[in-house]
A protein has these predicted regions:
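Catalytic core of pol beta-like nucleotidyltransferases
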Residues: 1-39, 47-53, 64-122
Length: 122
């Protein structure tokens, strides 16, 4: 188990699991280099005290392109590679992509809406 702490990531103050902090900073930094990403929301165990070292990091990525086009773009693949390579592939990620403005009322989006905004393109 872990402790949830207030952390400054980029220019945002978020509540996150202390043991995932370095990964979250890398997510925000890596997102800056992918112009397809508008916003990233962290959700799931990484914002709760039930998080463990083995927990994956759940992020919802919102972007301007349709899902199929975004996920196969070189920019987005490089973003995903930077996350995986950051700690020699020791940390796993669950990355969900949504086109900005095309969100639906699914249960997963309800959970995401309770998450912490890690990154917003300025």
């Amino acid at each position: 188990m872990c402790k949830v702490v207030d952390v400054k990531i980029g220019n945002r103050q978020v509540k996150v699991a202390d043991i995932k902090r370095k990964y979250l900073e890398n997510i925000a930094e890596s997102a800056k280099e992918c112009s397809l990403i508008d916003k990233i929301i962290l959700f799931g165990s990484s914002i709760e005290d039930r998080c463990t070292e083995e927990s994956d990091i759940d992020i919802a990525v919102f972007g301007s392109q349709p899902k199929g086009k975004a996920l196969t773009s070189k920019q987005f693949m490089r973003f995903a590679d930077k996350l995986s390579e950051f700690d020699d592939f020791l940390q796993s990620y669950d990355i969900l992509y949504f086109k900005t403005g095309k969100e639906d009322d699914s249960a997963i989006l309800a959970e995401i809406s309770r998450g912490e905004v890690l990154y917003v393109r300025e």
